[in-house]
Amino acid sequence: MRRNDLLNNKITIFLSSLSLFVIIIPIYAAEKDLLPPSTSSETFLTDEDFLRPLNDDETFLTEKDFKNGEKLGEDHVPAGSILWKQVYKKGDIRGKAAWKLDPKNSESLRRNGVITGTRKWPNGRIPYVISNQYNDRERAVLARSFQAYHDKTCVRFVPRTAVDNDYLYIGKIDGCYSDVGRAGGRQELSLDNGCLQYDTAIHELMHSVGFYHEHERWDRDEHITILWHNIDREAYDQFGKVDLAESSYYGQLYDYYSIMHYDSLAFSKNGFETMVAKQSEMTAVIGAAIDFSPIDILKMNLMYQCSDVKLPPTVVGTTDKTIVPVPAPSVTVVEDDCRDRTNLCWRWIDRCKSFFFEQIMKEFCSLSCGYCTPKALQTAKASPPNYSNTLLTKSSTSYLQHG
């Protein structure tokens, strides 16, 4: 008897499940029919309501962030100067691109602008998510950087959707770095403390768009001289040259004004210049850009064929957090002797604008922190360093390292 009861129960459960399945099918079909007839399911999912569910540590930029970005002050620190100090010896290119450029690999030639289709973002559309670690002002810097691409190119940074397997994750990971072009899957772009300036951000984003550094062009020896005896041996790979078989300059001349050019002291082991321009007056120019050069903009538009591409809509995310604009901190410029007074500044570059360390950094690392006027900067570059590490007391050093 008990056996028959069990059998009857199983039959009842099976029939109930079957009935539920039969009911679900027409509901699913009806919902699918709700899509506009001219819209595929993929493009329909790009609408804000269908943005991919975020992890707890991820978010998007909002309209308020973009409005706050318009209100930012001129907080520029020349990107070419700060980047190589922030990422000392490792450089700011990592991920698959960095592996390919490892001198231990046989394929270690660098490229200026990728030309292989697999490394470009389809239609210039770059899906992203950002870390929720960024404060209001940092989010505004990111928004302002995105908007610069939206205004000057057809590249669009858009919130990641459910169908975007390849995307940027922008977060405070480890200094300032990016992969080059579309690497596939989750692609990290690090903008850590010390990297959240507009010019640094657009530099790293231009890597993700698909460009290497300007001083790595194959023809760079016609325009700059590399002073190998001043370069730290572990940083030699930062001065590789491009592979013409896989790259293109898009018909453009060497660009001393590029946001992608490092400065003349990059990866110096002794404080002396590591590269100088063949046109001597250009040595002070390289690495001093605070925005895209006209050639930077032209090359990006040529890479993505912007005159023909169908621009995807700009979609912003949503958040319940109230955003309050935070004014950019003021920077005091050191007028006279603008030099680093210790050779340890590269270790503490992220403390340059810290509320607690700013005065110490102005005193001992004015050059590295970007507190020089253009005239003082040119004088400092032309002079050997004057390090006096004894000026840093043990307590000051400990405070900077652990405070």
Curated annotation (Swiss-Prot):
Active-site residues per Swiss-Prot or TrEMBL entry = 204
Q: Which residues are glycosylated?
A: 386
> What protein name applies here?
Zinc metalloproteinase nas-8
Output the GO biological process annotations, alphabetical, semicolon-separated: proteolysis
Class in the EC hierarchy, top level: hydrolase
UniProt cofactor(s): Zn(2+)
Q: Does the keyword Hydrolase apply?
A: yes
The record places domain ShKT at 338-372
Q: Which UniProt keywords apply?
A: Cleavage on pair of basic residues, Disulfide bond, Glycoprotein, Hydrolase, Metal-binding, Metalloprotease, Protease, Secreted, Signal, Zinc, Zymogen
Could you tell me where this protein is found in the cell? Secreted
Cofactor binding description: Binds 1 zinc ion per subunit.
Annotated Zn(2+) binding lies at 203, 207, 213
Q: What EC identifiers does the entry list?
A: 3.4.24.21
Whose protein is this, by species?
A: Caenorhabditis elegans
Cross-referenced InterPro entries: Astacin-like_dom (IPR034035), Caenorhab_nas-7/8 (IPR017367), MetalloPept_cat_dom_sf (IPR024079), Peptidase_M12A (IPR001506), Peptidase_Metallo (IPR006026), ShKT_dom (IPR003582)
Q: Which cysteine pairs are covalently linked by disulfides here? A: 154-306, 176-195, 338-372, 345-365, 352-369
